[in-house]
Structure formats: structure tokens, C-alpha cells
Swiss-Prot record:
Residues 1-27 form the signal peptide. The modification Phosphotyrosine is found at Y303. Residues 28-129 form the Ig-like V-type domain. This is CMRF35-like molecule 8. Residues 139-174, 284-318 are annotated as: Disordered. One of its GO terms (molecular function) is phosphatase binding. Upon tyrosine-phosphorylation, interacts with PTN6/SHP-1 and PTPN11/SHP-2 and INPP5D. It is found in: Cell membrane. Belongs to the CD300 family. It comes from Mus musculus (Mouse). Its main location: membrane. Inhibitory receptor which may contribute to the down-regulation of cytolytic activity in natural killer (NK) cells, and to the down-regulation of mast cell degranulation. Negatively regulates the Toll-like receptor (TLR) signaling mediated by MYD88 but not TRIF through activation of PTPN6.
Amino acid sequence: MTQLASAVWLPTLLLLLLLFWLPGCVPLHGPSTMSGSVGESLSVSCRYEEKFKTKDKYWCRVSLKILCKDIVKTSSSEEARSGRVTIRDHPDNLTFTVTYESLTLEDADTYMCAVDISLFDGSLGFDKYFKIELSVVPSEDPVSSPGPTLETPVVSTSLPTKGPALGSNTEGHREHDYSQGLRLPALLSVLALLLFLLVGTSLLAWRMFQKRLVKADRHPELSQNLRQASEQNECQYVNLQLHTWSLREEPVLPSQVEVVEYSTLALPQEELHYSSVAFNSQRQDSHANGDSLHQPQDQKAEYSEIQKPRKGLSDLYL
């Protein structure tokens, strides 16, 4: 379960971090829609955060939904002008104002109020912006004439969705695809890849978990035996050593031989002889226990002859 949770939450966390870095996830503050009449002037106020106080601000026109054509931008000064559009930064109150002069019906479109963010500012170079829908309506002032008037048909004018950029004929105007528009397709590709990895990892982890559950349900006794064997795996083997004795082998007798000596002592007389006899006790023990298979061939006796002692030495023998 721990591996399953980590496999699901890790891609989700990466996705949330990437969404946090998307342009517009920390938007500027301002109106979402503005409306003006033909020939009038229109001002839009955009508020930004204090950390963007020293950054350049710009106003651009959205093209093809993903590109933004730069109209006017504050590069080094707090105020810039391009044709009928003026932008002025107010660092004291953290706002900048965009002013349109002499609105026309072709000015109706979608615009962006944005702050220029460099690549080394910790936001991966994604600019902060928000979109504004600008609509322009015809002027309502009636045209009066002193003579008889003729009824003229009312012509309904529809607002165009696209139009030329303002101030395109002025010197120094830059009309190009802004860098944030170029980054957006790559960003969408990364998002799609992360979503694919998230779904694939989740399905794989869930499938592995289901397989384990199915195996445990089909063979409950096998899983129980395996658990018992794993718990008792240290006592499964015993080393046994057997010692055998050959039937042909005779028991080992003591290496030392006990010798019993018999001696007879008597008072010294003439022509007396003394003898001592020694028998092997090893042979007697083997006869008593029945372990010997053969009778001894002969018995050896040792004799010692003692002559009559000299006179005066008889007391020594006694």
C-alpha cells in the first residue's frame, strides 16, 4: 500500500507544482472586461505585486489564442507610448495604467496586461498576466442638420473579432510573437506527458495490487503455509551424525597388564628352594567376559630359585 500511495501521489505533486508555475496561476489584478465608444479614450488600470515593482510592464494583443503581439512596453522609463496607446507605471501604488485614445471599432479584441519575467527570476521565465476583453460600440451622438431631413436606413455595425494592431505605422513599434506565447505549446506538451505518466503509474500500481488480492483469495492455505514457513525457516534443517561399530572389532583392553606375583617365605633351612609365579591378568579377564574367541595356547610361569642364605642373613628374609 505504501508503494501504491507513493506511485500515485508523486506524479500528482509534480503536476501541481507545474500548474503553479503556469503563466496566469499567480495573476495580476484588474478588470476582465472593458467597454468604450468610438472616438473616446479608455484607460485600464492593472495592479501587480510588490516583487514585480522593478520589472517591465507591457500591453499586448492576443493573436491566434496563444500568441501575443507586443503593443507598448515600459523598458527603462516608467512611461512609454506607441501610436494611440500609452502605458505608465506607478511603483508607489503598485499599478500601471494603459490608455487608449480615439477608439475605433477595429480595436475590439482580447488584450493582456502583463509583467515581463526573466528566465533567472525563479519562475522559469513565465510572465505574469491576465486577459481583458475590450469591446467598442459606435458613438451615440445624433447628427443634426438645419434643412428637411430624410430618413436614412439604420446600419447595424457588428464588432470585428480581429483587427490590426494599434500604432503599427509609428517608428520604434515592435510587433512580434512574445516569448510566452512560444513557451505555451511546450508547456502544454509537458502537462500532457505528466498526465499520461500519472494515469499509467496509477493503473499499473492498481493492477499489481489486484493481482495480489486474487492470489490470496484463490490459495488461502498456500499463503498460510508460506507465511508459516517463512516464520519458521530457521528451524527446518538439523545435522545428524551417526557413529557405527564394526562387529569384527574386539573391545579395546587396557594397555597396562596387571601382574600378580606370589612369593613364599619360610624359615631358612637347608636345601630350601623358593619360587615365584606370575600370571597374565589380561587373559583371565578375557576368559571371564567371554570376549576372547581362542583359548590360550600355553601359560608361561616364571620361576626364580633362591639358595640357602648365608649364616647371619636369615633374619633379613624373615
